[in-house]
Amino acid sequence: MLAVWVPLLLPFLAVPLARRLAEALPPRAAAWLLAGTATVLAGGTLCSLGLLATAGLLQLPPVAALGHLSLPWLTAAAPSAPVAAALAGPVLAVLAALAVRTARRRHLELRAARAALPAAPARPALSALPAHGTDPADERTGPHPAHRPAGVQHADMRPLRASVRRARATRWLRSSLTLLRQPVGHQLAVLDDERADAFALPGRLRRPGRMGEPGRIVVTSGMLRALSGPERAALLAHERAHLTGRHHVFLALAEHAADLHPALRPLRAPLGYHLERWADEVAAARVGDRAVTARAVGRAALAASRSPWPARPRLVAAAHAGPVPRRVAALLQPRPSTTPATRLRAVALALAACLALTTAATLEATADLHRTVEAAQHEPGAPR
């Protein structure tokens, strides 16, 4: 099972390649590249550790008996599996604890930030749709049976009513999906606070018993007073771009990937930078002036550095985050090129090879373990 070790080693090679390639790409493409690389490599790491732990568990007598496996054959086929499992098992437990800690911390920070904001008006769009589960038979299209003329005979209407019910349910589903695909109006929350801060607060998904909430742009009165009118427009466009692009999902993926493999931690800072550059470019296009956007970024960062709002979550996007001088310099230059340099094609090919090899090695290791289990089950000494 040599293939199972490949996804654990390739991140040390792929991460520098991804960072090098991202520098030559436009901000949006760079953010997708870094987030995708982190996701693929973290998934391969998790699968490899799981396969190593599973291979060792299969050699435990109770597990072998439960799976009708020949324990002597398994021991001879993979003598080092228990040692690898003894290492992979605790590592998986630590990674699970880190993932829970990261998710819990993010949840508590977002909940505290939402609690500190004024109540947002409810989103009425879903109320215009038919209630899910309503019986369409209650909305009859024909006259009520009590109002029909006497002596008139009617065929059995149950098949027709079932067809109408299915058609209306299909229309309700299509309307719901259309609504979800439409851009959500992000609400603005202005806090009466002298401390200057502004950030994009992610919304909450709709769950049973709880209505969802759209994302909100949070800005303090201190931040608004620190900027001019055009600069305020650029700041709000920047934060709106974070919400529209779901940049909080990118940040969460990078944070969890860094918990799974130490080599993936260097991807967090460049991903945060390219997400801010992505929002900078959207804001510059929205206000139509790159210099105004650059001034807004610089002044917002200067104002927020004095006394930021204490309830701002750590894993949220903000206009004053990241290497601000570098972002301002990029905004004061022409629009970035959308084509990477020719000399970086080799870097792109090498990174693609690393990601493809990670995926192929994970699939091969999984198939290898499956073949081992099947062979152990068909051995003459396997319990029946």
Regions found by a protein language model. Give the residues of each.
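Membrane-interface helix-boundary signature
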Residues: 1, 27-30, 78-87, 340-350
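Alpha-helical transmembrane segments of integral membrane proteins
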Residues: 1, 5, 34-41, 84-92
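Membrane-anchoring/interfacial helices and their immediately flanking loops
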Residues: 1-34
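Cytosolic-facing loops and C-terminal tails of multi-pass membrane proteins
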Residues: 7, 11, 15-16, 88-105, ...
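Alpha-helical membrane segments of multi-pass proteins
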Residues: 7-10, 20, 37, 54, ...
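Membrane-embedded and juxtamembrane structural elements of multi-pass membrane proteins
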Residues: 25-32, 36-45, 114-346
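Transmembrane alpha-helices and immediately adjacent membrane-cytoplasm interface residues
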Residues: 44-47, 51-57, 70-114
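Perimembrane loop-to-helix junctions flanking transmembrane segments
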Residues: 56-78, 376-383
